[in-house]
Swiss-Prot record:
Protein name: ATP synthase subunit alpha
A Pfam family the protein falls into: ATP-synt_ab_C
Domain of life, per lineage: Bacteria
Binding site for ATP: G169, D170, R171, Q172, T173, G174, K175, T176
GO cellular component, one term: plasma membrane
Chief subcellular location: membrane
EC number: 7.1.2.2
InterPro entries per the UniProt record, alphabetical: ATP_synth_asu-like_sf, ATP_synth_asu_C, ATP_synth_asu_C_sf, ATP_synth_F1_a_nt-bd_dom, ATP_synth_F1_asu, ATPase_a/bsu_AS, ATPase_F1/V1/A1_a/bsu_N, ATPase_F1/V1/A1_a/bsu_N_sf
GO molecular function: ADP binding; ATP binding; proton-transporting ATP synthase activity, rotational mechanism
C-alpha cells in the first residue's frame, strides 16, 4: 500500500505542532581541588548548607563550607575517581535515609544501603538525617524502666525509657558487651533496637551481628555499620542516620533503644573533616562546635507525651577514655549532655569483676522512677553497702584486728561484689534479679562461702523457677515484693539441699 505524500506531510506537521522543547536548568559547579574525602567546588552559587550534591560518577557529597568563591563538599563514598575539573550538580535534596519496618533484621551502611548481601530494602519511606529534636511540651518525664538484664545496672544505675545514659570506659573494658546484653534482654519487651557501630573493625561488627542472630535478637534490631575502613564522612553521619531510623518508630508510638558505639570515633572523624575544611581548631584540635555535634544528636532521644503516641528513644552513647581520664574534652561534653553515666573501670575488669562497673562514679539522674517497686526496695542500700565496702577494703589491707561490725561489712561487701558479677550474653529477667538481691540484702547469703556465691545463685534461681514459680509470677504481675515469709521459706528450703564446698 503506497503512502501518499499528503499523509506524510500531515503527519510531520502534527509532530512539529505537538513538539515541546523541554529544558532543564541545573546549578553546576567545577571541582578545583580534591583529596582526603573533601572536594573544593567553584560555582554552585545557590547551594544550601547540608544539601546533597552529585559528582559526575554518581557519588554524592554533602555541602558543608559555603565560602565566597567556592563550596567545601565532603564526599560520601569513594573519591579516587573524582578529579580536578569534574562537574558537580546540585540535587535540591538534603541527606535522607530509608526508614521503616523493612530495615529490621538488616545490616546497612550510613546511607541506608544494605551491606549484608540479602538483597535490596523494600521501603519507599525516608527521613532526613538532621531534624530538630522534639520540643519541651511534646515530652514527658521518664517513668518506665528499661530492663538491661544486667544486675549491677538495673539495681545501682537504673535506666528508663527515653533516658540518655552514657557508657564510658577505656578500650577493652566490656562496653560493647553491656550494649549487646541489653539488646538481648529486650526480646519480649516490645522494643526495637538500633545498633550503630562507628569506626569498629569489620570483624567486631560481624561478631556482634552473629551474637544477635544466634540469640534471635536480630528479629527486632537494625545494625548501622560505618567500619574503620570507611571514609570519615560516613563515620560522621552514621549516628544521625541511626537516630533517623529510630525516630520513625518513636513517632509511631513504639519504644526504641539506640546504641552509639562509639561517639569518640565520630568526634575524631568530625575533627578530621573540620581540619581538612580548614575550620579553626579549638581544644584538643576539635572544632568549636563539637559539643553541638553530640548535643543535637542526643537531644533527639526522648519520651513523647501521650498525645503524640507515647513512644520513646532511649540512647546508650559510648565514649572511650584514655587511661581512665574522664575529664578529657569529649567525655566531659557527653557527661554534661546525658542523664547519667556508667563508668567501666579497667582495674575492676582485670581483677575479674565483670561487668566492671564502678558504683562510686556511675550515676543515673533518673534513678528510682526507672525502677519497679520491688527493685527499689531490695536495691535501696546496695550502693551504700558497696561504697562502704570499697572504703573499708583499702583500710583492711593494713590491719588484721578488725571489730566484728567491720568484719561483717567486709564479708557482706565481698558477697555483694560476687552477686553483681555476670557472664556475658546471659541477661537476667527482673524477677530473678529481685529474688537474688533480696537474699543478699537481707543477709541470707552471709553464711554461704564467697567462692560458692555464683553457684548458689544459679542453682537457687533454677530451684525457685521449678519449686516456687509463684515468687517470680508475683514480682512480674504486681511489680512489688512478695511477703518476707514467702521469700524466707524458699531460701531456707533451698539452703537445706545446697552443698557448700569444703573450706
Amino acid at each position: 500500500m503506497a503512502i501518499k505524500a499528503e499523509e506524510i506531510s500531515a503527519l510531520l506537521k502534527s509532530q512539529i505542532e505537538n513538539y515541546e522543547s523541554g529544558m532543564t536548568v541545573t546549578d553546576v559547579g567545577t571541582v578545583i581541588q580534591v583529596g582526603d574525602g573533601i572536594a573544593l567546588v567553584h560555582g554552585l552559587n545557590n547551594v544550601m548548607a547540608g544539601e546533597l550534591v552529585e559528582f559526575h560518577n554518581g557519588v554524592l557529597g554533602l555541602a558543608q563550607n559555603l565560602e565566597e568563591n567556592n563550596v567545601g563538599v565532603v564526599i560520601l563514598g569513594p573519591f579516587t575517581d573524582i578529579k580536578e575539573g569534574d562537574e558537580v550538580k546540585r540535587t535540591g535534596r538534603i541527606m535522607e535515609v530509608p526508614v521503616g519496618e523493612e530495615l529490621i533484621g538488616r545490616v546497612v551502611n550510613p546511607l541506608g544501603q544494605p551491606i549484608d548481601g540479602r538483597g535490596p530494602l523494600n521501603t519507599t519511606k525516608t527521613r532526613p538525617i538532621e531534624s530538630p529534636a522534639t520540643g519541651v511540651m511534646d515530652r514527658k518525664s521518664v517513668d518506665e524502666p528499661l530492663q538491661t538484664g544486667i544486675k549491677a545496672i538495673d539495681a545501682l544505675v537504673p535506666i528508663g525509657r527515653g533516658q540518655r545514659e552514657l557508657i564510658i570506659g577505656d578500650r577493652q573494658t566490656g562496653k560493647t558487651t553491656v550494649a549487646i546484653d541489653t539488646i538481648l534482654n529486650q526480646k519480649d519487651e516490645d522494643m526495637i533496637c538500633v545498633y550503630v557501630a562507628i569506626g569498629q573493625k569489620e570483624s567486631t561488627v560481624r561478631t556482634a551481628v552473629e551474637t544477635l542472630r544466634a540469640h534471635g535478637a536480630l528479629d527486632y534490631t537494625i545494625v548501622v555499620s560505618a567500619s574503620a575502613s570507611q571514609p570519615a564522612p560516613l563515620l560522621y553521619i552514621a549516628p544521625y542516620a541511626g537516630v533517623a531510623m529510630a525516630e520513625e518508630f518513636m513517632f509511631n508510638g513504639k519504644h526504641v533503644l539506640i546504641v552509639y558505639d562509639d561517639l569518640t570515633k565520630q568526634a575524631a572523624a568530625y575533627r578530621e573533616l573540620s581540619l581538612l575544611l580548614r575550620r579553626p581548631p579549638g581544644r584538643e584540635a576539635y572544632p568549636g562546635d563539637v559539643f553541638y555535634l553530640h548535643s543535637r544528636l542526643l537531644e533527639r532521644a526522648a519520651k513523647l507525651n501521650d498525645s503524640l503516641g507515647g513512644g520513646s528513644i532511649t540512647a546508650l552513647p559510648f565514649v572511650e577514655t584514655q587511661a581512665g581520664d574522664i575529664s578529657a574534652y569529649v567525655p566531659t561534653n557527653v557527661i554534661s549532655i546525658t542523664d547519667g553515666q556508667i563508668f567501666l573501670q579497667s582495674d575492676l575488669f582485670f581483677s575479674g569483676v565483670r561487668p566492671a562497673i564502678n558504683a562510686g562514679l556511675s550515676v543515673s539522674r533518673v534513678g528510682g522512677s526507672a525502677q519497679i517497686k520491688a527493685m527499689k526496695k531490695v536495691a535501696g542500700t546496695l550502693r551504700l553497702d558497696l561504697a562502704s565496702y570499697r572504703e573499708l577494703e583499702s583500710f583492711a589491707q593494713f590491719g588484721s584486728d578488725l571489730d566484728p561490725a567491720t568484719k561483717a561489712k567486709l564479708e557482706r561487701g565481698k558477697r555483694t561484689v560476687e552477686v553483681l558479677k555476670q557472664d556475658q550474653n546471659k541477661p537476667l529477667t527482673v524477677d530473678k534479679q529481685v529474688t537474688i538481691l533480696y537474699a543478699l540484702t537481707k543477709g541470707h547469703l552471709d553464711d554461704i562461702p564467697v567462692q560458692d556465691i555464683t553457684r548458689f545463685e544459679d542453682e537457687f534461681l533454677g530451684w525457685v523457677g521449678s519449686n516456687a514459680p509463684h515468687i517470680y509470677q508475683e514480682i512480674r504481675e504486681t511489680k512489688g515484693l512478695p511477703a518476707d515469709e514467702v521469700f524466707v521459706e524458699a531460701i531456707n528450703a533451698f539452703k537445706k539441699i545446697f552443698n557448700k564446698s569444703e573450706v
